[in-house]
Structure formats: C-alpha cells, structure tokens
Amino acid sequence: MAKVKRDISYLNKDFGDFRNQLINFSKTYFPTTYTDFSPASPGMMFMEQASYVGDVLSFYLDNQLQETFIQYARQTNNLFDLAYMFGYTPKVTSLATTQLDIFQIVPAKTIGTGSLPDFSYALDFPENTEVTGDGQTFTIQDNIDFTVSSSQDPTLITVAQVNGATPTYYLLNKKRNATSGDIQTTTFSFGEHQEFPTVDLQGTSIAQILDVFDSDGNEWYQVSALGQDSVYDKIKNTNVNDPNNSNGEEDTPYILQLKQVQRRFATRFIDNTTLQIQFGSGNAEANDEEIIPNPHNVGLGLPYTQDKLTTAYSPTNFIFTNTYGIAPSNTTLTVRYITGGGVASNVAANTLTNVDTTNTTFIQPTLNASLAQYVFNSVAVNNAGAATGGADGDSTEELRQNTISSYGTQLRNVTADDYLVRTLSMPSNFGSISKAHVQKPLNANSNTTLEIYTLSYDLN
C-alpha cells in the first residue's frame, strides 16, 4: 500500500485552531472512518483533549521563548541568569553605612607637675566588632586601637573627671565607619577531587561573602570570574611592605598589591535567597597549569607558542594561563557572610548605642583589676548622624533596566553615561545610590573633569 502524504499545518497556536485543524484533517484523510463531529460525540472528546494539550504546549513554548529575552522575561531566576550573561550583578539588598563615635575613659598618670592619659588602660577592639540599636546590627570592619593616633586615625582626648584642678580621668574618642548587617557562618565539606564544584548558600538578604578559609587555614579569594587569577589585596603602607612609599603612610595608610591566587571562587545569585559559590577545576596534587608566557615565547608565531598580541588585556589576568583555580578536596570550608541591609537599616541618629565587647582586650595585660573593670565598663558608642545607603534589592523592572544599561558600557568609563552607570552599579556592600547625576563643572572649561551628584535612601 502506497504511503499517503499528509498535509500538516504547523501554524496553529490555540485551542480553536488545533480543534478545527483536527476536524479538517479527519474529514480529509478519513472521510468514511468517522463522520460524527457533534460536540457530544466520543471522537470530538479525543480531538478536544488533543487540542487542549496542544494549546498548553504552545503557550509553554511561547512563554519560554519570551523568558530568553531580557526585555520580556518575568521569572526571577531567568532574569538573574540573563543579568549575569549581560555582565550585571543583581542586587538582593544594599547595606547602610554610618560613622560611629567610640568612647572609653583611661586614668590619668602624673608626669612631673602635670598629668597625661595612662594608655596602658587603652582598649583594642578587633575587626568586625558589632554595634546594635533600633533592631539593627552594624559592623565595624576595622580594628580600633586607642593607643594609635595619626592624621588618618586621630585619637581625640578630653578631660573626663577632675579632682580640684587635677585631671583624674581622660576621655578617649575614635571615629569609625560601620556597615549594617549580621555576620553569619556556615561550613561546607568536600570529598574527592571534582572539577568546578558548586555549593549553595541559603538565606535572606545576603549582601556579601566576608571571607572563606579551609580546614588547613588557607584563605580562598573571591574573583569576578574563575579565569581571573589575580586580586588586589589591601596591605598596610609600612617600610617593610613598601620602602619606596612608606614616607606617605599618614596620607595613604593602605596600598594595593596585585596578588596571584590559585584558591579562588566566583559567586552568582540564583534567586533572591540563594547565592551559588563555584570553585575551579584544578587538583592541588597535580600540575595542570599552562606554561606562563614570557618574552621568549610570546608573539613568535611558531607552533605551540603563546600569541597574545591581539588580546585585550586585564590587569587581574594579564598572563592568560587558562587555569581556573584549585577545586577544594578532602577539606571543610568555613564561610563567613553578611546578611541584612535594606531600607530598614537606615537608622536615625543616636540609635546605635550598644557595642559587643566580647573580644575586646586591653593593650597591656597586667593592670589593676578593679580599675581595669571600671575602665572596661566605661565603653560607649553612638552614631551622631543617621545611617544612609540601605536599600532593598532590585525589583523585576529595576533588574531589567539596570541590566540593559550596564551591558552598553562594557565596564568602560568614557562618556558621562558610562560614569552614571558605574555609579549606580556600586557593589551593595558599600551602600546603594538612589539617584545620580553626572555633568561637566559649571565654572570650568576643562573637558577632562566630570562632577557626580548622588542621593541615597534614608529611613523613610
């Protein structure tokens, strides 16, 4: 029997089109097999069921096609994927910042006919000391050493108590910037070596990863992409670290140092509550790196040599060794991360008054116990100004528009609009810009200067 060629239409999109096409198909190719096309007939029941399935699949196909375009996508996870594809990092929260005054008293000691503060009773606050108030937690990322005073970090001294005309106690005051958010800790265990392993960090309002250490004490560094093999590391500007520039340590207390790291990871938000951490593919026990380029093998044009003459260079990955870092194996990683922020973190002035002194210590270990306790109890903290910069994460439409704007700049700063986009794309751990405006200075003829005006959210 000869095979009959069927005329099939692929243009049907909804229930009615599918139903009519099935009826016409049956009448054309099975004219005597089935002739009852009334609504109550069994044959129409099967045709309408098939039309129903076709309509659902057609809708699903159209919807999924829309979800592949940033202009039309509506599902959060698809918008996040598209944002990363276009080079924009979604914001799920932004942290507020404020300046704090930290106080303590120290006893006076007699020097000749006068008196000076006894700095042996000065306190040392470690990094990431927490301050609370009005239901919010703020973190002081820098340590506080009251014995150190410089133009960049002055210790203000005033008389706190007197006996007649003689000071008995002095009040020490330091200022520090604080960022909203709670520090959370979690661990992930890894077994045998696996290329590009991923782990998911679950939580609400995840702002940033603070640090990652393995069970051997090695630090893992966050990079924007696993192909980036170097990071900028902040180190103190001392004579040991940089003899050539240490004479300017008061104006420049820290310097940036380019550091090549093999233990690294990249992060991306899957949705508003899930941060995925991905590691590299290398095995710490195997040498799988490419030979680092040097002047003897770059640009010779010979087989199996490096040719980097037409490559766009990045200062954080200028050797292009095609390595993606080490994958953790047979270890446990401890991850500290910050959660919180949002508009609610823009607390009013004079509300951050409680400081955690659990890890606070005296500079000198041997002191009078009762006097030391009195000094320790004198610790106080306050924010003279309101916290600003806290904002909720990107809404669906904000995420869409920010992604489209960010893609056009390609991370460059050339035009005024480029600077505007870079300003609005500030990492969330530094706060959030609500509105920004870029223009040339009104009273300057220079074409090389731009002024940036910014506004941030307050509590209301």
Task: Please give the residue ranges for each predicted region.
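Signature of Asx- and small-polar-rich beta-strand/turn repeats characteristic
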Residues: 1-460
